[in-house]
Amino acid sequence: MSLITIVGRGHGGTRAISHTLIASNVYMGEPLNRSGDLLPPQAMYEACRLLARSVLWQGDLRWDFSQLHTMPIPTEFTDLIHTYLHKVLTAPDEHKGWKIPETTLVFPWIVRMFPEIKYIHWVRNPRDNILARHLTDDLKDFGVTYPDAETLLASRYPALLAAATVAEDKEELLWRVRRALSWHYQHAIVAATPKPAHWIVVRFEDFVRDQTATLARLEEYLGIPLGRIVVRSETVGRYDRAEGASYFDFLEEGMREFGYAIPS
């Protein structure tokens, strides 16, 4: 029996791998939304807020996650996770798993609770990732302290802020900064966590451009045959066709790690 989970930010193309696993007879729980997220999510959301209390914001774009790796995991947290995953964990299926983007926000304790399961880290170019809204755009909703978007713009990118003279443009710019901060934070929390025994990184773009080769990697990793799903090539590189800012320099480290081009 194998248990699988996906680690990846919302709007990161994670529905593609969830739908792939479902098409491959992997039980992903029920009910699911159209993105393949296990519902209801409230217990997971509360677990995110609980873990966030033990993350120390050091100011600017720095957080200290170190105590998450050694402190006792609160019973309240494990109870919330077991509540959320009840149908998956008690299912008799040979292969099963779950997907919800908020798993990334609790990754350090999920790894400690489930050290032997198979993790798929699903990443997407943040320049595409920040173009559309997701529930995790404002990390304060999940208890995470991070810089104020407008203050950050004023100090680091004053020209961008000054150019946003229309209210709607300014609002969209602020949300893109929040999404970029969310991507950056989630990259940081995963990077700071000791990796489990079973860990693979897959880029959404590689899945779209060469599904066959990417599925071959995943099949070798998971040890099961995987079905194909329909993908749309236009989901890659949308930032080239989008108006407004899609890159902030604090994203550079994460982008380089995953092999994404840095704009000049």
Predicted regions and their residues:
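Conserved phosphate-donor/acceptor-positioning beta-strand/loop module used by diverse small-molecule
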Residues: 99-100, 110-135
